[in-house]
């Protein structure tokens, strides 16, 4: 229950920050263009707080923190006095209207850049892209445990999360990946990971596991959490014991233990379970029992081992971080557009479209991992908001920009009827997209 409320809280914080910047972009440029702003609202519904400025703008915080809006003086929406007509949005030139509408997404793009600059200055703690175990395609490529991936297809890699993202993108593009690695003794080498051999279709969320890369920080001996009464483990194994090996095979994860117990059961002989209990190392001979479901069991429940300390963090000076933030914003934009293209063309599953439930969970998880991770999450979300708002769908900023582009081409605005039809189409498209996102959230 604690995680549920924490997720809601961090989602509200995230949306509030991003929406405030987005709407301020519209507001600031509108004021510079001489448009009267009637209301600047963060959130919808009943106002929880409001204040009117000397310029006549009402600033509002709404009860439903899932968006916001800037309401401008417009003759198409209400009667406007003769004295104020020059301040109406619809009276401004096409280029001024384009600037006002584009300012929202641009503000989110600038926020993304600013957040990345802060991130490069303070640093983001992470785990290096060090391989803990190499199997399948990774082993065939000549990758070994202890190898640290430093670049993929010429793009520098400093963490496992960057490596995972690049490998996933290459796999979805059905392309092989060239990995530069540094071995445990400093030896450098290059390996081609034949991602084109991955059986189609595959789960894009688990590409590294599918190619046989298990990151070192994830491989920790499991800890016994509970003993089932009446099981063969009762009296032999105790809560808090750490499983080190089964029949001489090192146990580096809960998944390892499960697979090793199944093998013992299939082989039909007792196995030696090596455990650490405090400072003592013990070897126990146990035979798993088969459950009614056909699964071999010892009768224990485990927790993952202790998470190791972060081993990767890069910091830069205030000035040195500026070009890095600009470059990273460009790379993230290209990556995001690439993913959207893959979803549209069918190279990637539509399951990658996330809704508010997933966003809330990710917001909470990133906040738990530290300030740097939360800032990185905000930068990604801000960039996504900028890109999505530029989609040429009526209702979104991109739809309005499409209307103004048509107006420039034909020399006059679209008819009210045509724009109304576009709004209905936009509503339908947006509702479908949101429905898919919610569906993916519920399935996830």
UniProtKB/Swiss-Prot annotation:
PROSITE patterns the UniProt entry points to: PDZ (PS50106), ZINC_PROTEASE (PS00142)
EC number(s) per entry: 3.4.24.-
Tell me which cofactor or cofactors this protein depends on.
Answer: Zn(2+)
**Any one Gene Ontology molecular-function term assigned to this protein's record:** metal ion binding
Give each disulfide bond as a residue pair: none
Q: Which domain of life is it from?
A: Bacteria
Show the GO cellular component annotation of the record: plasma membrane
- One biological-process term from Gene Ontology? proteolysis
Location in or out of the cell: Cell inner membrane
Alphabetical list of Gene3D superfamilies matching this protein: 2.30.42.10
Family assignment from sequence similarity: Belongs to the peptidase M50B family.
Official protein name in the record: Putative zinc metalloprotease XF_1047
């Amino acid at each position: 229950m604690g995680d549920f409320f924490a997720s809601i809280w961090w989602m509200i914080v995230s949306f509030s920050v991003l929406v405030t910047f987005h709407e301020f972009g519209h507001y600031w440029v509108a004021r510079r263009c001489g448009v009267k702003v009637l209301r600047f609202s963060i959130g919808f519904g009943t106002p929880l707080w409001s204040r009117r400025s000397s310029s006549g703008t009402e600033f509002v915080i709404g009860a439903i923190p899932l968006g916001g809006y800037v309401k401008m003086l417009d003759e198409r929406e209400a009667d406007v006095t003769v004295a104020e007509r020059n301040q109406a949005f619809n009276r401004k030139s096409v280029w001024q209207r384009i600037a006002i509408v584009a300012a929202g997404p641009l503000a989110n793009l600038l926020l993304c850049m600013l957040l990345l600059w802060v991130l490069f200055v303070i640093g983001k703690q992470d785990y290096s892209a060090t391989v803990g175990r190499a199997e399948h395609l990774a082993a065939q490529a000549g990758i070994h445990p202890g190898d640290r991936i430093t670049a993929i297809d010429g793009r520098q890699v400093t963490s496992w999360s960057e490596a995972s993202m690049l490998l996933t993108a290459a796999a979805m593009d059905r392309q092989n990946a060239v990995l530069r690695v540094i071995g445990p003794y400093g030896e450098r080498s290059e390996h081609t990971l034949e991602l084109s051999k991955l059986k189609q279709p595959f789960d894009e969320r688990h590409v590294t596991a599918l190619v046989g890369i298990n990151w070192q920080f994830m491989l920790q001996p499991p800890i016994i959490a509970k003993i089932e009464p009446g099981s063969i483990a009762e009296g032999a194994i105790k809560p808090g014991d750490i499983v080190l090996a089964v029949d001489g095979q090192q146990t580096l994860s809960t998944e390892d233990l499960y697979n090793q117990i199944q093998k013992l059961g299939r082989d039909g002989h007792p196995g030696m379970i090596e455990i650490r209990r405090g400072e003592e190392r013990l070897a126990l001979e146990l035979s798993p029992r088969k459950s009614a479901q056909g699964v071999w069991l010892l009768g224990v429940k485990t927790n993952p081992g202790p998470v190791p300390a972060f081993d990767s963090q890069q910091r830069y000076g205030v000035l040195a971080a500026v070009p890095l933030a600009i470059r990273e914003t460009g790379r993230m934009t290209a990556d995001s557009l690439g993913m959207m293209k893959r979803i549209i063309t069918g190279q990637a599953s539509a399951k990658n479209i996330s809704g508010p439930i997933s966003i809330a969970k990710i917001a909470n998880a990133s906040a738990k991992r530290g300030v740097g991770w939360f800032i990185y999450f905000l930068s990604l979300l801000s960039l996504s908001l900028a890109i999505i708002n530029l989609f040429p769908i009526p209702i979104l900023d991109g739809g309005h920009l499409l209307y103004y582009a048509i107006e420039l081409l034909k020399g006059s605005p679209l008819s009210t009827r045509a724009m109304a039809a576009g709004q209905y189409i936009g509503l339908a498209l947006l509702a479908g997209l949101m429905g898919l996102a919610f569906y993916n959230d519920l399935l996830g």
